[in-house]
A protein has these predicted regions:
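Acidic/His/Gly-enriched intrinsically disordered linker/tail segments
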Residues: 1-36, 40, 46-83
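Beta/coil-rich, acidic/histidine-enriched accessory regions frequently appended to metallopeptidases
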Residues: 51-260
Length: 260
């Protein structure tokens, strides 16, 4: 944990695993990888890669028999743990960094909120939406996946980066639609609760394009998140082109209901 890298991470965490804008901050995946598959998993990916694979295609081949659904299951597990830094190596330090994830959504009517362009999960990236659960014992989130290329919410400025870093001076692009992708869209989503004693509680994961999921909120929940992973039906290789508008996005909208 360092202040500089972490602040950048919280601003850019929704991006694809190999996105150029998080090339120095996207290290939490490797904590999840080595914790689940052993310390040598990291070195095996580099030593046993085969052209034209990227690192995650090599991971799928070595550990998941090239099963894309298993890959997304592994990525959702990683994302849901990353939201509270639930990794053994991070345990001594993670308490000070709780409650920092955020995502922007815009109202689109009838209680629905649409994910902002600037928070939309890219292919194999995730969004962590904090939920204000005070006084409630059950939450239901209705989910609707949107087609890539769909219109942004009316209030969404639709600004994007053009340049080699995600810095304010490079926030010069403008769009009124989400980025398109040459693949059918897909998602994984569910809940994560962080309790006051540091315990984490995870819901089951859902993969429906449209549906409603509920979660009984544990007592002593301090932070509650709805986590959405971008999981298109075919693997998307991420190209370093310094143009955010070319990055595959998996947009969605949600409606949140509480029971007290």
């Amino acid at each position: 944990f360092t202040d500089y890298e972490m602040e950048t991470w919280f601003q850019q965490y929704h991006r694809a695993l190999e996105n150029e804008y998080t090339r120095y901050q996207n290290y939490w995946w490797f904590y999840a990888l080595t914790e689940q598959y052993g310390l040598d998993a990291y070195s095996r990916i580099w030593r046993e890669s085969a052209y034209p694979e990227d690192a995650y295609q090599t991971f799928m081949r070595l550990y998941l028999a090239n099963d894309l659904n298993a890959f997304y299951d592994a990525l959702y597990r990683y994302a849901s743990h990353a939201v509270t830094f639930d990794f053994a190596a991070a345990a001594p330090y993670s308490a000070a960094w709780q409650g920092r994830y955020d995502a922007t959504l815009y109202d689109v009517g009838d209680g629905w909120q649409r994910i902002a362009y600037a928070s939309c999960p890219e292919a194999n990236g995730f969004s962590a939406i904090p939920l204000d659960h005070q006084g409630a014992n059950r939450v239901t989130v209705s989910f609707r996946g949107l087609q890539p290329g769909s219109a942004l919410a009316a209030d969404d400025p639709g600004l994007y980066y053009i340049g080699d870093e995600a810095t304010p001076e490079n926030l010069t692009g403008h769009t009124r639609i989400y980025n398109a992708v040459d693949a059918a869209p897909g998602w994984r989503y569910g809940f994560v609760a962080y309790l006051t004693d540091g315990t984490r509680v995870y819901s089951d994961v859902c993969a429906e394009d449209e549906g409603a999921v509920s979660f009984d909120i544990p007592e002593e929940t301090q932070y509650l998140y709805f986590v959405v992973l971008g999981a298109p039906e075919s693997y998307q290789v991420h190209v370093w082109d310094n143009d955010e508008s070319m990055d595959a996005q998996m947009p969605f909208e949600i409606r949140v209901e509480w029971r007290k």
